[in-house]
Each structure stands twice: as C-alpha cells, then as structure tokens.
Design a protein with these regions (language model features):
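Phosphate-interacting basic helix/loop segments used at nucleotide- and nucleic-acid interfaces
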Residues: 1-15, 59-67
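Short acidic amphipathic segments
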Residues: 15-18, 267
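P-loop NTP-binding catalytic core
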Residues: 25-129, 174
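Switch/coupling sub-region of P-loop NTPases
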Residues: 133, 149-263
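Hydrophobic anchor at the beta1->P-loop junction of P-loop NTPases
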Residues: 135-137
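Walker A (P-loop) phosphate-binding loop of P-loop NTPases
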Residues: 140
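Conserved lysine of the Walker
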Residues: 143
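Conserved NTP phosphate-binding and transfer environment spanning the P-loop NTPase/kinase superfamily
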Residues: 264, 268-272
Length: 272
C-alpha cells in the first residue's frame, strides 16, 4: 500500500497514533509529547479517500455511502475510516500502530512516573506468582503495551496463547524462541471456539487483547475458572469497576452475585 506523506509518521517509533479529520487536520499522538497537531497540506481529503479505497480493496471490503465504516489492518497497523456521508466535515481516519516490540521498560516506567518502583516490582512478582491481571483504562491509554510488558515477565518455559480479534500483542514475533500460539478470531472461529482449542494446547497463560463483548467476558471467566492464568484489558474508569464492567457486557441474565463472586475470587489484580 502507498501511504504517501503519512509514511514518515509511520516510520517514527515515537508516534503511536495518527488522526485525520475536519477537512485537513492531522493530529499525532506520541510517547513523549502527547497529542499535537501538524500542518500538512499534502494530507487532505482527496489523499485520505484514495488511501481508504486502497485499504478497502486490500481487505476485500466496500467503502461508500451504503457501507460508510471501514476497519482495516496490516501486520502492525489498525485503521478505521468514516465516510464523508457520515462525517459531514470530511472523511475521518484513525491509524494506530501496533508494533511487534515492547515499548515499555522499567526505567521508562519510573522516569515518566507511570508507576512507582515498589508497585512495579510488586506487579512483576504477581506475574511470577501467576496472578490473574486485568488492565483497565481509556482508549489509547497504553493498556496493551502494559500487558505486553507484563507478559515479558512470564517464565521462559511457560506456554502462552494469545486470542485476539485484531492482532496487537505480537508476542510470537517479540519472543520467537518461546512456545507461543497466536490465535485470531473471525466469523469462522469465535472466541468460544478458539478458547476450546486453546485449552487443548495446554497453555499456562492465556492473553486476550481486549474484553469488549459478552463472548470475551465468558472466555475470561472460563479461562480462569479452569486453572489457567490470564492477562487482559478492558475499558473501565477505575480498577474497582472492572468486575461490574465485565458484568455489564454480558447479554444474558447471569446471576449478578454469582458472577461477581467468581470474578472477585479468580482475578487477583486490577490495574488502572
């Protein structure tokens, strides 16, 4: 694919997200400066529409007034487009980079006051002790990056299986020498079916990239109740809200006390 003037931003490791909106505004999200706007007249509606149609062709999808939303992905990119029939001030796009690398390390976490040393060392011990951990936060807050970092603290001989609907963790590429199976759910292989297959692979750790559906919630609960250990993420406004947030995603009339009791019993650590 031809990313044209966006290529320089995609090649810059410090940039995590590229947002286009409002007929020509380009916003970058970086690891050190946060979010800021750049002036780039060559990145305009015409260019973004061309890029969207390239993506739709590659993905075998349609992008037009009848199908105004497009999700696309490559090995290390996630892209979302909104057609100008819906985004009335011009086509909108968000590109998120999902590189096969661990961006976090202890020095970075401490220097940027992301975490205290005492808490950092405690979390590492929790991983070493096989605690089940859920990481909560807003979109783009770094949940997946923290999960990748914590996963790097698992033991070398412990088998990991990742189950994702969009590939973001890339642990099989980051640790090519380890016993890691990367599963991607789709219309044919659901979370439930992938989890059943996963259990037969005898993993020590099961990593779900994000819990955002009833099926994913049940996958987490079934994983932890069967004795496996999990690292996963969820959208929640604080750590103590994680159990209720998981319950709110369920579509069936699950008994709330029984469900929350199982979550409190089996998930030892919530991080926000």
């Amino acid at each position: 694919m031809d990313f044209g003037p966006l290529k320089e931003f995609l090649e810059e490791d410090n940039i995590t997200d590229i947002s286009y909106s409002n007929g020509g505004q380009v916003w970058l999200k970086t690891l050190d400066k946060g979010i800021y706007q750049v002036h780039r007249p060559d990145i305009n509606n015409a260019f973004m529409e061309k890029l969207a149609f390239q993506c739709s062709n590659v993905m075998g999808k349609t992008f037009n007034m009848a199908h105004p939303f497009l999700d696309a992905e490559s090995a290390e990119l996630r892209m979302n487009f909104v057609h100008d029939s819906i985004a009335t001030n011009g086509i909108a796009c968000l590109i998120r980079k999902t590189p096969a690398k661990i961006r976090l390390n202890k020095d970075k976490l401490l220097n940027e006051q992301y975490i205290t040393e005492q808490l950092h060392d405690f979390l590492v011990k929790c991983v070493e002790g096989h605690a089940n951990i859920m990481v909560a936060g807003e979109t783009g807050s770094g949940k997946t990056e923290l999960v990748k970092y914590l996963a790097s603290k698992t033991k070398e001989d412990e088998k990991i299986i990742t189950i994702e609907d969009t590939l973001e963790l890339h642990l099989d590429k980051i640790f090519p020498q380890r016993d890691i199976v990367a599963m991607k759910t789709n219309n044919i292989a659901s979370y439930t079916e992938s989890l059943v297959a996963c259990m037969r692979q005898n993993p020590i750790w099961i990593l779900l990239s994000e819990v955002r559906s009833a099926e994913a919630v049940l996958a987490v609960r079934n994983s932890i109740s069967s004795g496996h250990h999990i690292l996963s993420t969820i959208h929640a406004d604080k750590a103590s809200s994680i159990p209720m947030r998981m319950y709110s995603l369920l579509e069936t009339g699950q008994d709330i006390e029984q469900f929350l009791g199982s979550i409190h019993r089996y998930i030892q650590i919530g991080i926000y």
